[in-house]
């Protein structure tokens, strides 16, 4: 049995720069889109004879839009840039934050001396990435992209490999 756990806590992600008028501007990003406070990955490998079972979990902590960029009046004129429906519709709200996100993957492999076969499922629960307002973060069809979320959904796979001994 082999267990691997890696967790990262984002203590600070910031930018300080001097404006044209000489004033100093400081921007803190931790906890915002792309800079969740916590990220983790855990895996378990159980090997028995020629079999290997893998379980992997990925975790992204909750995130929120920069408080300075939140538009408190975004629905004042019955407009939402996440869909064409009324702004009171839950599916049309301004998505400025996302809950924590976790996905699981599992695979099973059989290994011989010079070949192996494997199969598995990525994103076992078919968990979609959180909804996001693409006018405020990088996104496509109200889904955040480039932040570590799985955009493909559940995926099944088969692997086969053969080691050709060429003698050199």
Could you tell me what each predicted segment is?
Residues 1-67, 159-168:
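Gram-negative outer-membrane beta-barrel transporters
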């Amino acid at each position: 049995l082999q267990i691997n756990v890696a967790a990262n806590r984002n203590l600070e992600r910031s930018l300080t720069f001097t404006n044209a008028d000489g004033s100093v501007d400081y921007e803190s990003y931790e906890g915002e889109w792309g800079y969740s406070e916590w990220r983790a990955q855990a895996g378990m490998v159980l090997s028995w004879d020629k079999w290997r079972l893998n379980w992997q979990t990925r975790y992204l902590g909750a995130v929120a839009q920069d408080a300075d960029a939140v538009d408190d009046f975004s629905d004042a004129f019955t407009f939402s840039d996440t869909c064409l429906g009324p702004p009171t519709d839950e599916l049309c709200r301004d998505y400025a934050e996302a809950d924590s996100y976790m996905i699981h993957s599992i695979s099973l492999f059989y290994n011989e001396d010079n070949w192996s076969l494997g199969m598995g499922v990525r994103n076992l629960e078919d968990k979609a990435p959180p909804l996001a307002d693409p006018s405020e973060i990088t996104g496509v069809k109200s889904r955040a992209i480039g932040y570590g979320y799985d955009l493909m959904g559940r995926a099944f796979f088969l692997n086969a490999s053969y080691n050709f001994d060429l003698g050199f």
